[in-house]
Curated annotation (Swiss-Prot):
Belongs to the ATPase C chain family. The gene is atpH. This is ATP synthase subunit c, chloroplastic. In plastids the F-type ATPase is also known as CF(1)CF(0). GO terms for cellular component: chloroplast thylakoid membrane; proton-transporting ATP synthase complex; proton-transporting two-sector ATPase complex, proton-transporting domain. One of its GO terms (molecular function) is lipid binding. F(1)F(0) ATP synthase produces ATP from ADP in the presence of a proton or sodium gradient. F-type ATPases consist of two structural domains, F(1) containing the extramembraneous catalytic core and F(0) containing the membrane proton channel, linked together by a central stalk and a peripheral stalk. During catalysis, ATP synthesis in the catalytic domain of F(1) is coupled via a rotary mechanism of the central stalk subunits to proton translocation. It holds the Pfam family ATP-synt_C. PROSITE patterns: ATPASE_C. The chain crosses the membrane at residues 3-23, 57-77. Its main location: plastid. F-type ATPases have 2 components, F(1) - the catalytic core - and F(0) - the membrane proton channel. F(1) has five subunits: alpha(3), beta(3), gamma(1), delta(1), epsilon(1). F(0) has four main subunits: a(1), b(1), b'(1) and c(10-14). The alpha and beta chains form an alternating ring which encloses part of the gamma chain. F(1) is attached to F(0) by a central stalk formed by the gamma and epsilon chains, while a peripheral stalk is formed by the delta, b and b' chains. The record marks 61 as: Reversibly protonated during proton transport. It comes from Gnetum parvifolium (Small-leaved jointfir).
Amino acid sequence: MNPIISAASVIAAGLAVGLASIGPGVGQGTAAGQALEGIARQPEAEGKIRGTLLLSLAFMEALTIYGLVVALALLFANPFV
C-alpha cells in the first residue's frame, strides 16, 4: 500500500472522530443545561423533561458514533486502496 494513502487515511480517521464529536458535545451540554433550567423552573414537569432530554441525547450521540464508524472504515476497510 502507498504510504501516503495510509498516512492520509489515519489523519482522516482522526479528523472524522474529532470533528464528529465537537457538535454533539456542544449540543449535549446545551441541552442538559436547558433541561436543568426547565426542571428548576417547573419541578412538576421533571419526568417529561427528563424523558425528552434522554431521547435527544441518544440522537445526538448517534452522530458521534457515525463518525467513529467512518473512522473505523478508513482504518480497517480502506476504500482508497
